Every structure is written in C-alpha cells, then in structure tokens.
Amino acid sequence: HKTIDNVIKRTFKHYYDHTDADIIFDRGPWGIPANLELLKKYYDPDPKFLILNRPLVEVLASFLKVKKSGTDKDLTDSLMDPNTGKLKQDMVSSRNIVKSNLPHLKIEYNDLVSDIKKTIEDIYKFFNIPFFKHRYTDLEQLSYNNVKYDDSVMECNLHTIRTDKVKKEELNLEDYFSKDTIDKMKGYDIYV
C-alpha cells in the first residue's frame, strides 16, 4: 500500500520534469470520481478546473468531419461508450466537477473562438496567472519537446490547426445528423 502511494506521488511530482514550462494545464477527465480522488490525495487537495463547453451535437459533428475511415455510427459509439469513450469520460468529468461545486471556470466554445483575447484573460484571472501577450494570427502547428503530432496513426485528424487566425468553422449539422437527432441532442445538457 505504501509502495503504491509512493509511486503515485512521484508520478504526479515528476510527470512533467522534462517540460520547460512554469504553468501546465493537464487535459484529461480529472473530474471522474476515481481520478479526482487521486488528484486530491496525491497532488492538490484543492484543485481548480477549466472546462470548455460546446454543444454535444457540434462536438460529434466536428469529429465526424475529420474522421478518416469507418462508419459514423462506429465513431460516435466509440466516443460515447459509457466505459471507454473519450467524449463520454469528458462529459462525466465536467458534470462531476460542476455538481461537486469544485472551483472551476466554464468557458463557452463560441466565446473562445469569437473573442479569444478576452477569454484567455478570463482564464488568467481565474487561475491568478500573470498576463502574457499572445499572438492570435500566423500560428504554428503544435509541437511538444520538438515533436509534432502525427495523426496518421489516429482515427481522426485531431491536432492540425488553422494557422491564419482563430475562428469558428461553421458546421452544417444536417450534413452529419437527421433533423430529429439534431433536435434531441441540442436539448441535451450534460450538467443535469
């Protein structure tokens, strides 16, 4: 038992040792009860969370837009699988954070893409981070420790960004779903 505790503590402490950064936002379903328990026990008893909120129907459509192969049903079933689905885990995590009244900032996707400067400033304020002047045009593809993402091994091209500027790309939802399905998903609130 103590051995496992030591391993977990050191994992949290040293996971980002090789990363040259003062501040790191770790993306993951940390609000899932088991993950939250580990986070509070081994890293920070009072964690703060950032939640990016976007309508479910838009999230699913954006995945379908960039999928490389397979059926739409296979991809949505995979994303929404109650036990292993990435999107389902993120939804459960976000819901648990909000319902648990843990300190969190929920930002809307539309606010992020329509007024990124203000949204970033709101994030800095919430996390008490000193302001940093960002560039929102002429962007570069993400690399991490001089390694760029290779989405050729993924089901979807998830990491390539538009480099000219941050903007919302409009999706015609009816290209991906029936009107009935769109109406059902538009009324779905993950926080209820």
Residue ranges and their predicted role:
Residues 18-134, 147-155:
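PAPS-dependent sulfotransferase catalytic domain
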Residues 64-67, 99, 125-192:
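PAPS-dependent sulfotransferases, especially Golgi type II membrane carbohydrate sulfotransferases
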Residues 7, 11, 35, 90-95, ...:
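Alpha-helical packing segments of well-folded alpha/beta enzyme cores
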Residues 1-35, 42, 158, 162-167, ...:
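PAPS-dependent sulfation machinery
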Residues 2, 6, 85, 117-118, ...:
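Generic alpha-helical secondary structure signal
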